């Protein structure tokens, strides 16, 4: 070993010991010929002092040190002189009196100072330097502890950790695939998996019964501020279980994770139905750290003459004290709504004497003005925001306004934790709504799956999949923490007939189903057990535990919001030779052979023989 001790673990009890340390120069200070450096390694920082005037060679070497030089230092641990202790660091009572110094690696001029703020693009370009800083390094190390804690829980429950393929065939799962050309099969492509969904179900058919994996997943989605094209899930699947069993195991995992940061999650975690969550909070990911619930006003305005409120849905959310906002702030709310694709955000101001003001109030009848404040629970000095239009989009706007109001008023305790299970979502949603929300609607039908096509309906709804499609409830559950969905799962379909019916509702024809999912349907014919599971978004979960706003902070080498890696400059063009070798431009032709569909290409020499 190049060192005998970890720098950050030295204490007063080590005084008198000869030690060899190795790490980086965090700081260098020169005080009248005596040189001090803060030596940093993975364990922390220790002060090293070069003070022997007789050892001119070591002093000369120390004079040449600069920030982030990688060095090895030998010396004796000593108690710091009286008055020189540093209570800010764990090693603040001691220092190492250096007797030798070896420079293991010099450091070029730094692109940014590690003890000063830097822009994200620069940080990601030099991520290996960024990770030398305390907070980024701590976040990555916490992630390792999170992995270990989850594995320990699942090992106690006899789960088997199994790796599933990361190059497979392209199957529609709700997002676009990343495609990989298959060089030995010109014109054909592998796909990087969006999830291990199909393989973990096959593992249940195989009799594994309890599977998990910390799985890498890939989705070619449109650029979003806090999404990554590659991400990680804690993926779990169990046979012979119902939703209650999966929720119980999940709560045990979550309890163990939050114990890492000293918080005990009260269990059982409360539950709320999907429909209730949408009605009260405008979202299926409600933040329950504060109130400000939405108020349904559709019936209240059922006879209104105000055309804006003559809509399928009218709802409101109250901003306490919001009537004092200046006009420019209220105008800013309109811009805020327009940025979210809406025409604006109607409002009524409740004056201190209870009278109503603002542009909407003058369009209301006397009866509406008289009863409005009581109906929505507004008090003098409050502002009432409204949204009117289609139910889903109007509620979504009010749900976003609710969170924005809470942020502006400081109503959210950043140290609080609020967990909730959102259960009983619909199995299907209109395909046009999914597309409008930026999702990929699988199939060509009027309906697509809310979660994915393999989610089972609640047993009592099985007979109404075709006749009452929009009302069918899924046997599914999402876990939400502080307004973030950190996991989601369901009981799966394990019968071929039900799976085929779901595919049909989604507009997948039999030929497409057989081509893309035939292997799964065939497996269901060989004694498939009832099964279900859940997947936790591991990046988001770890970010919450680390107190980070962005998942990029808990990923060792993340991409930007635009999907670019500033460090390696990926993605990058390929060479003409790579393009030729990959067969990416080959034109496949479908032929039927031995009841199987194969991809061949007329441009490949072996085909033309």
UniProtKB/Swiss-Prot annotation:
Region (Aspartate): 197-200
Catalytic activity: tRNA(Asx) + L-aspartate + ATP = L-aspartyl-tRNA(Asx) + AMP + diphosphate
Site residues by UniProt (Important for tRNA non-discrimination): 31, 83
Residues involved in ATP binding: 219-221, 228, 485, 537-540
Single Gene Ontology MF annotation: ATP binding
Localization (cell): Cytoplasm
Positions contributing to L-aspartate binding: 173, 219, 451, 492
Keyword check for Protein biosynthesis: yes
EC numbers, comma separated: 6.1.1.23
CDD domains named in the record: AspRS_core, EcAspRS_like_N
Classification via InterPro entries: Aa-tRNA-synt_II, aa-tRNA-synth_II, aa-tRNA-synth_II/BPL/LPL, Asp-tRNA-ligase_1, Asp-tRNA-ligase_1_N, Asp/Asn-tRNA-synth_IIb, AspRS_core, GAD-like_sf
One BP annotation, GO: aspartyl-tRNA aminoacylation
Listed PROSITE patterns: AA_TRNA_LIGASE_II
Protein purpose: Aspartyl-tRNA synthetase with relaxed tRNA specificity since it is able to aspartylate not only its cognate tRNA(Asp) but also tRNA(Asn). Reaction proceeds in two steps: L-aspartate is first activated by ATP to form Asp-AMP and then transferred to the acceptor end of tRNA(Asp/Asn).
Assembly: Homodimer.
Protein name per its UniProtKB record: Aspartate--tRNA(Asp/Asn) ligase
Organism encoding this protein: Mycobacterium bovis (strain ATCC BAA-935 / AF2122/97)
Lineage summary: Bacteria, Bacillati, Actinomycetota, Actinomycetes, Mycobacteriales
Gene giving rise to this polypeptide: aspS
């Amino acid at each position: 070993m190049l060192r005998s001790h970890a720098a950050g673990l030295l204490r007063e009890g080590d005084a008198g010991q000869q030690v060899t340390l190795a790490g980086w120069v965090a700081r260098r200070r020169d005080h009248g010929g005596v040189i001090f450096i803060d030596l940093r390694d993975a364990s922390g920082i220790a002060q090293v002092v070069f003070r022997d005037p007789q050892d001119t060679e070591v002093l000369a070497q120390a004079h040449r040190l600069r920030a982030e030089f990688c060095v090895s230092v030998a010396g004796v641990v000593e108690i710091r002189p009286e008055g020189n202790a540093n209570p800010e660091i764990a090693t603040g009572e001691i220092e190492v009196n250096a007797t030798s110094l070896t420079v293991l690696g010099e450091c070029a001029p730094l692109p940014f100072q590690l003890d000063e703020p830097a822009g994200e693009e620069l940080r990601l370009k030099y991520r290996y330097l960024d990770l030398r800083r305390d907070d980024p390094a701590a976040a990555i190390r916490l992630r390792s502890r999170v992995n270990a804690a989850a594995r320990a829980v699942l090992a106690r429950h006899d789960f088997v950790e199994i790796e599933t393929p990361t190059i497979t065939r392209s199957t529609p799962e709700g997002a676009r695939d990343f495609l990989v050309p298959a060089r030995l099969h010109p014109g054909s492509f592998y796909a990087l998996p969006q999830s291990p969904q199909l393989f973990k179900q096959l593992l249940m058919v195989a009799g594994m019964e309890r599977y998990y994996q910390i799985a890498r997943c890939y989705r070619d989605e449109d650029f979003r501020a806090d999404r990554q094209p590659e991400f990680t899930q804690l993926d779990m699947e169990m046979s012979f279980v119902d939703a209650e069993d999966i929720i119980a195991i999940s709560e045990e995992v979550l309890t163990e994770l939050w114990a890492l940061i000293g918080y005990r999650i009260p269990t059982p975690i409360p539950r709320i139905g999907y429909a209730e969550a949408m009605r009260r909070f405008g979202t299926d990911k409600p933040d329950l750290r504060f109130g400000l619930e939405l108020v349904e006003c559709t019936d209240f305005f059922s006879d209104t003459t105000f055309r804006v409120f003559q809509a399928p849905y009218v709802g409101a959310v109250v901003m306490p004290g919001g009537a004092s906002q200046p006009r420019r702030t209220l105008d800013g709310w309109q811009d805020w709504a327009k940025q979210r694709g809406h025409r604006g955000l109607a409002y009524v101001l409740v004056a201190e004497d209870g009278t109503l003001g603002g542009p909407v109030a003058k369009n209301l009848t006397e009866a509406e003005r008289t009863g409005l404040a009581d109906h929505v629970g507004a008090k003098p000095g409050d502002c009432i925001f409204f949204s009117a239009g289609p139910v889903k989009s109007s509620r979504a706007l009010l749900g976003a306004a609710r969170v924005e109001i809470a942020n502006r008023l400081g109503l959210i305790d950043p140290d609080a934790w609020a967990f909730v299970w959102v259960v009983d979502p619909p199995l299907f949603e209109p395909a046009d709504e999914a597309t409008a929300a930026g999702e990929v609607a699988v199939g060509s039908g009027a309906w697509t799956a809310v979660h994915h096509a393999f989610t089972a309906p609640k047993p009592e709804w099985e007979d109404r999949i075709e006749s009452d499609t929009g009302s069918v409830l899924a046997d599914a559950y999402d876990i939400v923490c502080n307004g973030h969905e950190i996991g989601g799962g369901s009981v799966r379909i394990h019968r071929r007939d039900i799976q085929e019916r779901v595919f049909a509702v989604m507009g997948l024809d039999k030929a497409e189903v057989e081509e893309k999912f035939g292997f799964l349907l065939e497996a269901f014919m060989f004694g498939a057990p009832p099964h279900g599971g859940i997947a936790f978004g591991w990046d988001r979960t770890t970010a919450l535990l680390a107190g980070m706003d962005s998942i990029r902070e808990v990923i060792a080498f993340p991409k930007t919001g635009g999907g670019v890696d500033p460090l390696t400059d990926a993605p990058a063009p390929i060479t003409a030779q790579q393009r030729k070798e990959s067969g990416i431009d080959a034109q496949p032709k479908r032929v039927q052979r031995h009841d199987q569909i194969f991809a061949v290409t007329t441009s490949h020499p072996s085909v033309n023989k």
